[in-house]
Amino acid sequence: MLLTLTAVARAQDAATGAVAGRVTDASGAAVAGVKVKATRTATGAVRETTTDADGTHVLTSLVPGEYRIEFEAAGFNPRALDHGLVQVGARLTVDAVLDVQGRAETIEVSEPGVSVPTGNGLVGGVVGAGVVENLPLNGRNFLELAFLLPGNAPAPNFDPTKTNVVAISSAGQLGRGGNITIDGQDNNDDVVGGPLANLPQDAVQEFQMATNRFSAEQGRSAASAVNVVTRSGGDTLAGSLSVFVRDDALQGLPATFDRTQEAPPFSRQQYSATLGGPIARGRAWWFAAAEYRNQDSVVQTGTRDVAARTIRQSLAAAPLNDFLGMARIDVRATDQDTLGFRYLVQDEDDVAASTLDRSIGSATQRQSSDNRHQQGLATWTRVLGTTSVNTLRASYSNFRNVIDPVAPGRQLTFPSIQDGASFRVPQGTTQTRWQFSDSLSWVKGAHSLRVGAEYSHTYGRFDLGVFREGRVELVQDFAQFDLNRDGRVDDDDLLFAVTLRSGKPDQNLLLDDCSSSYISGFVQDDWRVTPQLTLNVGLRYELDSDVKNISGYADTNPIVQAFYQGDRGRDLDNFGPRLGFAWTNRRGMLQLHGGFGLYYDRVTLEIISLERGLDGRALPIEVRAGNVFFLDPGTGSVPPFAPTFADPFTGFILPGAGASGINIIDNSLENPTVQQYNLGARYRLPGDAVLQLDLVHNRGTHFIIGRTVGEVFNPVVGGPDRVVNLESSVGTRYDALLTSLEKRFGRGQQLRVSYSLARARNYANDDQIPFSSGPIDPNDLEREYGPTPNEQRHRLVLSGSFLLPLELRLSGIWTIASAVPMDILMPDASHRVPTLSRNVGAREFENAAELNAYLTSLNAKGGIDGVPLPLVREDARFSDSFDSLDLRLSRRFALTSSLSLEAIVECFNVFNVTNVLGVSKTNYSGFANVLARDSSDPADAGFLRSSSFGRALTTAGGVFGSGGPRAFQLGLRAQF
């Protein structure tokens, strides 16, 4: 007997897998009518089918897990395979060769290796429960598993609600997009983008990441699709209890921290528990998991040392409490019907840094967040016959976020640091979603077909206290002159250009019912043309009902009606064809694959909030002149009636000067679209390791940017106001070689190597919401084309788990990446140097000498608007590479036949490499990127010198995160 095992990602339900293959006799002839039975080991649930005339068998919509697969046919020996592993979003191919009747035979597969797949050319991978359990994930967040696979990296922070969230940047996109599902349920933030809820790490059964070219069954993403399946109970009562601890005695400090300051204490404790078992053996099962994290952490901040005229790196307290819970019940109601019910809850509060417009913020720029999330899911799977299965899902989710400043006050935006309280808070958002989906899969001859549809309605609500306390735009980090003639030079002598404050400072901006419905349908056919060649053909349609604010269009400001062109309607032509091929040689050693797909990204409801909120009426911004306008160049002083640093909002109004303007949604705005192409190969190496290489080319169109298109007189502000058009007029490009090597051994041992060689380009440091910045020249958007802020040309990740002598297990993750680029900003940090493209640091300029040569040439031509720019230090840096090795050493002790205790020691960043990196989209490099002058006096030599530029400000991961200073963590896990 011969059984060939293969695992392959293909067109499967987002929460299930499949078993398929071909049965032949000893001569190679197909055997029809073979009864194929798959029995799930944990529960005894059975699915059956028979082979067709070609000997082909397919069982779809299987719950991921371990199965016994049996073959029975008249005149042949019965055969069976034990421990066949069905993975999420993947097909386990079992090809069997039957011989004439004799003794029965069972093939024991304790842990299948990785084989060359057949049937699909998807770019991605699956991370199983054993990997999730053994690898040292620094934050114990399931989304960190995405970084083990090529083409994925952390994304910059893009919104105050996401300061403690793992956001994934896939295939060059920046984190707002992507599609994350848990058990097939949408887990995405439709309000601002990015992921929504976390779940206990020990509740994850499997994690699948489709980085590129996924099937028509999955959509609403122009980047990647993440499918997570939670664990379920079995016929045996089983559970675990874990604790992980670390504190400042086991933890280093960031290299940028000023050691002359006292470091606040910090610690973290994480507790996790699981328990599951039968309600009625063979019929119903339950499972529950809970995790609690109590963290007294710190965040990296800056402190203005006025006496020393420098900005010192410091730390500020950032406590966090996070409870995660999950419970599910699975019922085998009949032999054909399976019901599933799952509930998730997250209750989290934290203090963290707010979203920054500068490279670093002060301690007062922290914010206090309160997040509540819950979701429920019901699933009904019905086996309609030996070749067809239908799955119906209904779900509800609710998310509420409230953010307040740690202390009220105005925002002080210095060129090099953001001080005071963030102007973005207080704020709160609410999202409620109802979702319904149905999918039908059936096998007809050589065709494996799936067809389905989805409907969801998302209600969004914004409660925004933005600009209530105001914002002061300063032009220098420290005062240079005694402006007020009081005999000393201090902060009362600081120069500031403008102030911005809400014209209604006593009330929040409330935007209710920012809602939209989503409708989609798909058909997918995986056609096995020959035993070696499969064609993947699919078509998906998607529609968002109201992301263009159709329901609020009649209420837009009449003074901007002339700027709307044409009629506003829904984007109705979002058809996404998918076409691919996969060819495998007869020996099953080599697969060639490739294809094309058209993918549409979601448009977040924040777009609606911009048109409704920044309409020139709902949130009027008073822009007033700063004391710069009152400066007497002859005396170097300001008159007594000028606005002061202590009382800055007394200047005369400058209508339209620096405010966000009136935002309008272009009537032709469309969903961002990406054309994805790939061509690749998989090859089985000696020792059953599999090497995969994919050439990927993605071209994005219709991405959103805000462009100033004119001015109108706004009676609310008493003068002209600029009009900003939110339009689908820019694109993206991503070209990459994605490589992976995977090998599985017995007893949970495995090795994975992932490498990405990539180039990512776009037109903005935020690829959806152009709120805080716009193009240098609104009539020449090509000047905005440049690297994404988190582009890493090279990224290598090695992960694995191995058994050592003395029954020790060593597991690790080693991440090495090249430097990200850096924007180079003007001395007042208002925008980048206008003669430069975006993010040219560490790209066009490799070192300070090259930048200084450019600046010298620019100054010789008159500088910017006749003012020369300062040169930087010879040792100034733009960016830093990344290198972090995380290890776990553990040993399991068997206390009884069913109870074990595992002792765990983890070390993160073993070699204590300093990895300078930022968090904000404004400056992700972590180095000071403002050409801040040493002196604001044109007669002083410091006017043409910027000593602070290129200085390291923040390190990757802060204190606790990945790539941060070396840290040890101790753990203990009991299992039964």
Model-derived segments and their meaning:
Residues L2-G128, D186, P200-D202:
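Periplasm-facing N-terminal accessory domains of Gram-negative outer-membrane beta-barrel systems
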Residues E133-D189, S221-R231:
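Extracytoplasmic beta-strand/coil segments of soluble accessory domains associated
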Residues F142, A155, N549-G576, G580-N725, ...:
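Solvent-exposed loop/turn elements at secondary-structure boundaries
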Residues A238, P264-D349, S368-Y396, P577:
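Transmembrane beta-barrel wall of Gram-negative outer-membrane proteins
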